Structures are given as C-alpha cells and as structure tokens.
C-alpha cells in the first residue's frame, strides 16, 4: 500500500519555488495595485484552487460575516460551534454544488438582527415598560423575537418551565454563480438554526445555575416554525425574493458535553416560494469512542477501537489511551476524529507509533468517509494521519523540530 509521508522540509522547498515565481511577478502586481488605488477599488476575484477535496471557492477580497462573533458567543460549547458551521457547509453542498457556486459568508442577517431574532416575543405591556434606549437596543418596536413569549412572567423558574429559549443562534451562508467573481447577484442561501437541548437559568443574579432538558419533539417543532417565520422575513428583501433557500435545524449538546450536537431536519425552499411545505428528517448522532452509545450504533467499530487501544498499550510504553469522536449518519460512521496522547522521548518512537496507527486505520477505518488522527505530546502536535473520501490512501504528516 502506498504511503504518503509529508514533511515540513517539503513545504519549505515548495514555498521557495513559489517565492522565485512571485518575485518575477512582483512588478506586475505592483502596477496592478497602483491602478486599483487610482480607481479607488479593489479587484474582486475568486480563489481558483480547492484546498482539499470538494470545497467551495470563495469570492475575494473575503467579506466577513455581518454576524461575525455570534458563533462563538451564542453556542452552548465550542464543539457545537465548529460542528454547526462545518456541518451546515456540508449540507449546503448537497443543494449548491461546489462546481456551480462560489461561497461567501452571510451578508444579509447582521448581528443586531440575529440578536433580535433570538429574543423572546414581547407582549405589549413588556414593550411599554421599556425606556426608549432599551426598545431601540432590543428592536422591541419591531418585536422580531422568535423564542416563546414570557407573557409578562419574570420568575426564572416559571419561564424555564413554560417558555424557555429554544433558538440559540442563526448562521447564514451565501452562494453565487461560479462565474460571478464580483458577487453581484446572490443565487442561493443556507440558513442554519442552532437549537438548545438544555435551557440554563439563574433564580437570582450571580446565583447558582440551573438547567432544564428540553423535549426533542418540541425542539424540532419550534425550529420548523421559526424557519417558516425567517423565510417570510428574508423574502421581503428584493435580492432574496427569487432564490432557493435551504434551512437546517441543529440540536446542540449541553454546556459540559465534550461531543458536538447533530442536525435533525432540513428543507430547501424553491425560488420565490414563501412557505415551507415539507421537511426531511436528518438522522445524525455523535458519540465518543469507545463508549456504550457508540457500541449500540456500531458495535464492531467500538470493539475495533478498543482493540487498537489495547495493542498500542502493549507495543508502546509511553501510550495511555486514544479517545475518538465519531459522527454517524443513518447509523453509518461518516466522520471520525481521534486524539492519541504520547509522552515524547524521540523521533524514532513517534515515527514507529505513527506507522502502526496508520496501518490500523487502514485496517479498521477504511469504510469511514473521513478521519483525522492527531498524535500529541500534551498540546504539541507530533503527527497527523488523515483521509478524506477522495483519498485512496491516508495522508501522513510527521511534524519536525517540534520538541
């Protein structure tokens, strides 16, 4: 089996080669820059290379999301944030193929608007009780909140019982025709709704935090209703009136979870349509390896992972135990991430354990679309073994001079 070992020195040679070519082009680029300065504009282009596999090309210069920062602020834990964004992009690829569309971060739903959507619906008495500044800050006059109304209730415990916040975040992704490198006319949009699975509250300011688990059926029901309302609102924008819009509902894990959540439903609304007629259930599950939960879904994979751990402990004294996170789609393992901790004593040992794990990955993980195995000494990366569904063999990267 062919092995691919990628070393940093290779990257250095590549960069050096590119550098010579860049020097030859520098005068030409300088003239281009001067011309752009004179015209008062920056040339808009699209990236022309996929970094890895089936990825979108992006419009340059890159425009940051109008809601930048909310992904980190509003998710229950960091695992949810990354999984929500990456998973939404994967779902987008099924609707807006990477060969036909360019990608741009969301430009239509800004931070203030999304925050207003995350508020509860206000009653008239609640709006009347606000001063002008508070009304303006919360956009209370527009009353855009999508979460259930508290109906004037102020007791945190009763709110948790009767009208908890289901919607935690909204993420927008925009798509343009492959030839529209200036991003003149949007051709499609994906909107993700991140839902809470647990509602957290305090009975008094700076007091103990309490939690209430939310019902799965109600989470999905609320998400679908909210998506319908968002659709009617974004259709009011002339640019978004006649484009397909894909919606996906994501159920987060709780604050203390070390695994991310999963998408539970999705739908695509065709051009010009203002109502959502049907949804498709998404059957995703994320589990730790090894674990009872993973064993219930794929006992063979769970047992194989245990066997790898046992073998590593037998052959390498400085190995403790690997921990993996696997994402199942319709009970089939699709993505796997593994952290392998070692105590570093020398490069030969790192190479040996990397070679062995690569062999085991080919043996046990070959049916998984994507996997990434990170070999670490504490926080220091020592090696990376990865494979995408486009790779015939695993890609292996041993880090040099990283003692």
Predicted regions mapped to residue ranges:
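Short edge beta-strands and adjacent turn/loop segments
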Residues: 159, 163-199, 316-342
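Post-signal peptide N-terminal segment of mature Sec-exported envelope proteins
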Residues: 26-58
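Positively charged n-region of N-terminal signal peptides that target proteins for export
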Residues: 1-4
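Surface-exposed beta-loop interaction hotspot
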Residues: 257-312
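Bacterial signal peptide processing site
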Residues: 18-22
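C-terminal motif of bacterial Sec signal peptides marking the signal peptidase cleavage site
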Residues: 13-17
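Short, non-transmembrane amphipathic alpha-helical segments
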Residues: 212-239, 348-370
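Hydrophilic extracytoplasmic domains
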Residues: 290-403
């Amino acid at each position: 089996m062919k092995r691919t070992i990628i070393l940093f020195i290779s990257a250095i040679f590549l960069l050096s080669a590119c550098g010579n070519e860049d020097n030859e082009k520098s005068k030409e680029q300088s003239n281009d820059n001067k011309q752009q300065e004179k015209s008062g504009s920056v040339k808009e282009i699209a990236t022309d290379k996929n970094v890895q596999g089936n990825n979108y090309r992006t419009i340059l210069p890159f425009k940051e999301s109008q809601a930048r920062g909310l992904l980190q602020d509003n998710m229950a834990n960091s695992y949810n944030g990354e999984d929500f964004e990456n998973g939404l992009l994967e779902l987008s690829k099924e609707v807006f193929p990477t060969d036909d569309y360019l990608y741009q971060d969301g430009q239509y739903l800004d931070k203030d608007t999304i925050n207003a959507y995350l508020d509860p619906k206000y009653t008239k008495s609640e709006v009347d009780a606000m001063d002008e500044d508070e009304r303006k800050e919360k956009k209370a006059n527009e009353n855009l909140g999508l979460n259930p109304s508290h109906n004037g209730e102020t007791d945190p415990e009763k709110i948790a019982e009767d009208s908890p916040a289901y919607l935690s975040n909204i993420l927008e992704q925009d798509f343009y025709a492959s030839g529209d490198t200036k991003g003149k006319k949007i051709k499609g949009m994906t909107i993700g709704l991140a839902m809470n699975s647990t509602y957290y509250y305090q009975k008094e300011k700076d007091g103990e935090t309490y939690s209430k688990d939310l019902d799965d059926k109600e989470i999905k029901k609320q998400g679908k209703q909210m998506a319908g309302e968002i659709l009617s609102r974004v259709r009011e924008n002339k640019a978004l009136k006649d484009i397909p819009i894909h919606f996906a509902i994501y159920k987060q894990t709780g604050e203390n979870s070390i695994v991310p959540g999963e998408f539970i439903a999705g739908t695509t609304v065709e051009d010009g349509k203002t109502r959502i007629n049907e949804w498709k259930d998404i059957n995703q599950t994320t589990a730790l390896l090894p674990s009872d939960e993973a064993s219930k879904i794929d006992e063979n994979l769970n047992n194989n992972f245990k066997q790898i751990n046992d073998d590593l402990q037998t052959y390498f004294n400085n190995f403790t135990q690997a921990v993996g996170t696997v994402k199942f789609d319709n009970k089939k393992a699709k993505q796997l991430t593994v952290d392998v901790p070692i105590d570093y004593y020398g490069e030969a040992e790192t190479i040996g354990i990397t070679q062995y794990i690569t062999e085991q990955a080919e043996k046990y993980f070959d049916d998984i679309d994507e996997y990434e195995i990170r070999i670490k000494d504490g926080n220091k990366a020592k090696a990376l073994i990865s494979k995408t569904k486009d790779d015939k063999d695993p890609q292996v990267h041993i880090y040099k001079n990283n003692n």
